[in-house]
Amino acid sequence: MTAHKPFSAVILAAGKGTRMRSDTHKILHALAGRPLLGWVLDSLAPLSPDHTVVVTGSGREQVENYLKQVDLPVTSVTQEEQLGTAHAVAQAKSALKDFKGDIVVLYGDVPLVQPKTIKALLERLHHEDKPTVAVLAFRPDDPRQYGRIVTDKTAHIQKMVEYKDASEEERAITLCNSGLLAIRAHDLWPLLSRVQNNNASGEYYLPDIVMLALSEGRQAVTVDAEAWEVSGVNNRAELASLESLWQNRKRQDVMKDGASLIAPETVWFSYDTEIGRDVIIEPQVYFGRNVKVANGVTIHSFSHIEGADIKENVEIGPFARLRPGAEIAEKAKIGNFVEIKKSKIEKGAKVNHLTYIGDATIGAGSNIGGGTITCNYDGFNKSRTEIGEKAFIGSNSALVAPVRIGAGAIIAAGSTITHNVPDDSLAIARSEQENKALWAKKFRQRKKKK
């Protein structure tokens, strides 16, 4: 989906975000497990921008630290004073002074704009009429808080007006300004230099470049977007609303792709969750980041899954927890109140209940009895437990790592295993049972005499 013409992106992320009431920068709050800014960068990635410039301000250290972790090459510049969106974009000039292509302006708190929409916005600059500015427009359910765009029948802008300044006729228009726009670099910088701050807020507003272009007899146009794509986040309630919107869309996509969600509204996905066909997901299941679920899997209620790779025809839960590094092979079973971390459960193995498996490999066809614990941490280091194929681990066993249980071996219930067990061997590591005849009766009699 690479853009046909050279382009650069400017992402505005300098706002203080005070309405979030948080020590975390607003654009680093997570939507479906990924920071808001990460969504914007991810939408740009398939378009291969020549440059991506993030304009930071308040809390810039947090933003810059995050940018060091992303794959897309990004330059950050700083808006020292919060003097408006036009002033913020102007701070990117130093990073783009030699760039001759198109520039798209995006917002770090508007996370869901799609790559195809950004591409359409940029391509509109190169239609036959060669507009100076292309503005992303939308029609919200409640347009009262948005500025209006007055256009002719060919989507050429005639006027842009804030709601408070609009006439009754203009307020009846439902086409609104998202704030996102595309413009050629050689047009942007001169127009920005002409923006004035003679308004109630004393700020320099980016949309003013549209009216400046129109005043010079140049053209500006709109490109339509769905309202959900340009929904922004200013507070936690809006973040929750956007999370709900995204989750609903994801649930619909998962079901369209062939999975069954018994109670869709109770299942929560992350941005990168992959679900195969003929998967059944019961109510109240949570997917954290980096989860892949293959075809034919059943996930029972109240399971919590993150960082896990689940292969075909596996059964999970109910009340199972899969943590990062869990690899569950074909036809394995992970039952209720089982926790798996950094472990591989091989084909057909069963871990049915009340068990912790960490830093381990469970061989194909093995059975892990209820109450089994892999004791993988000695207070300083993690060690591994290796269990061979078709081994049987009796209930309430403690496997003290590092330790290897051979293929076909049997561990007697209640054992604490501290040494390797050879293949096909029986290991018993518990005190020998001793029965004392009539001891209980005598004990009760003594107690009654007191």
Curated annotation (Swiss-Prot):
Residues 237-257 are annotated as: Linker. UDP-N-acetyl-alpha-D-glucosamine binds at residues 12-15, 26, 79, 84-85, 107-109, 147, 162, 177, 234, 323, 341, 356, 367. It is found in: Cytoplasm. InterPro entries: Bifunctional_GlmU, GlmU-like, GlmU_C_LbH, Hexapep, Hexapep_transf_CS, MobA-like_NTP_Trfase, Nucleotide-diphossugar_trans, Trimer_LpxA-like_sf. Keywords: Acyltransferase, Cell shape, Cell wall biogenesis/degradation, Cytoplasm, Magnesium, Metal-binding, Multifunctional enzyme, Nucleotidyltransferase, Peptidoglycan synthesis, Repeat, Transferase. It catalyses: alpha-D-glucosamine 1-phosphate + acetyl-CoA = N-acetyl-alpha-D-glucosamine 1-phosphate + CoA + H(+); N-acetyl-alpha-D-glucosamine 1-phosphate + UTP + H(+) = UDP-N-acetyl-alpha-D-glucosamine + diphosphate. The active site is at 353 (proton acceptor). Its cofactor is Mg(2+). Its main location: cytoplasm. CDD domains: GT2_GlmU_N_bac (cd02540), LbH_GlmU_C (cd03353). One of its GO terms (molecular function) is glucosamine-1-phosphate N-acetyltransferase activity. Pathway: Nucleotide-sugar biosynthesis; UDP-N-acetyl-alpha-D-glucosamine biosynthesis; N-acetyl-alpha-D-glucosamine 1-phosphate from alpha-D-glucosamine 6-phosphate (route II): step 2/2; Nucleotide-sugar biosynthesis; UDP-N-acetyl-alpha-D-glucosamine biosynthesis; UDP-N-acetyl-alpha-D-glucosamine from N-acetyl-alpha-D-glucosamine 1-phosphate: step 1/1; Bacterial outer membrane biogenesis; LPS lipid A biosynthesis. Acetyl-CoA binds at residues 376-377, 395, 413, 430. Homotrimer. The gene is glmU. Its EC number is 2.7.7.23, 2.3.1.157. GO terms for biological process: cell morphogenesis; cell wall organization; lipid A biosynthetic process; peptidoglycan biosynthetic process; regulation of cell shape; UDP-N-acetylglucosamine biosynthetic process. Catalyzes the last two sequential reactions in the de novo biosynthetic pathway for UDP-N-acetylglucosamine (UDP-GlcNAc). The C-terminal domain catalyzes the transfer of acetyl group from acetyl coenzyme A to glucosamine-1-phosphate (GlcN-1-P) to produce N-acetylglucosamine-1-phosphate (GlcNAc-1-P), which is converted into UDP-GlcNAc by the transfer of uridine 5-monophosphate (from uridine 5-triphosphate), a reaction catalyzed by the N-terminal domain. This is Bifunctional protein GlmU. It is an enzyme of class 2 (transferase).
